Amino acid sequence: MTITDATPSGEKLRTFTLDSLTERMSVREIIRARIWQEVRDYNAKCGEIFHGLVQPTDAERALNGWRMKECRAIDWEQQFARACEAFERNGFFLLVADRQGESLDEVFEIRVETEVQFVKLTPLVGG
């Protein structure tokens, strides 16, 4: 399954392949698999920039990611909880093969060639 981070206008910011696949996955399971993999990859390298869906504690926004104040392991479960909260608050939405996931419990058929787009929404200033 291919994961793409995109803007609301459709610009692709980052694309990577997700290792965890089952034939049917809920939106919650897709988010969980994505968060687990990106945190695992970051913790293995412990770089300066975390390229993840949600902002870790003690990090600041950087170009296409989050600048970490110090090299430390990120807790994937905490990131997963924050991502689910962000989804429910409409902080982002996801498209599975061009179909929008409406709830965390909605289930989709998943194939190797399935593309999932995560689209982060930017709140309007003053609105």
Residue ranges with predicted function:
Residues 1-127:
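Ubiquitin-like/PB1-type beta-grasp interaction modules and other compact soluble beta-rich domains
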